[in-house]
Amino acid sequence: ELPTFGVGRIHTLFMYPMTFDEFLNANNENGLISMKKQADSQHPLDAAFHEKLIEYFRIYLLVGGMPEAVLAWIKTHNFNQCSHIQEDIILTYEDDFSKYKKRVSPDLLRTTLHGICHQPGEKITFKQISADYRSSQIREAVRLLTLAGLVIPVIATSGNGIPLDAEANEKNMKILLLDSGLL
């Protein structure tokens, strides 16, 4: 059971990690955003700008899009500083798991999240996440992590038309973390 709070006194705002374009904008690289949007097969980016975009993308993959980590990067250009902030964010998420303890063990949520982080971009196998829990328990933990917005399941489909999920195969699934910097 989740704690209650006063109705009408809370304004909900859903926030997500910054996109790559927002990351570029935060780094005052609006010119790169514009060039990237205008580039196509007929008018490709100049090699120098392409290299600069690749470098920024590599940084983005490490720093991620969490606003505090991005701000730390802009101020310090220090990956260690960003890493400390990312660790604090993960610990905050894990501390929050206790509010789900009536439905799922906080240890199971923690184990599932760490297991997902150790299989980035790979087909998820629940046994690799943990041999200590049943698949149904891990599936429920993944469902709660998805509802919380911490992970994004990507389900394979062999559909050739609409709707694509008509031939979805949930046994062949990858699970992405909400932000690459938190890996």
Residue ranges of each PLM-predicted region?
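Accessory nucleic acid-recognition modules appended to NTPase machines
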Residues: 70-183
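Interdomain motor-coupling "hinge/lid" segment immediately C-terminal to the ATP-binding subdomain
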Residues: 2-118
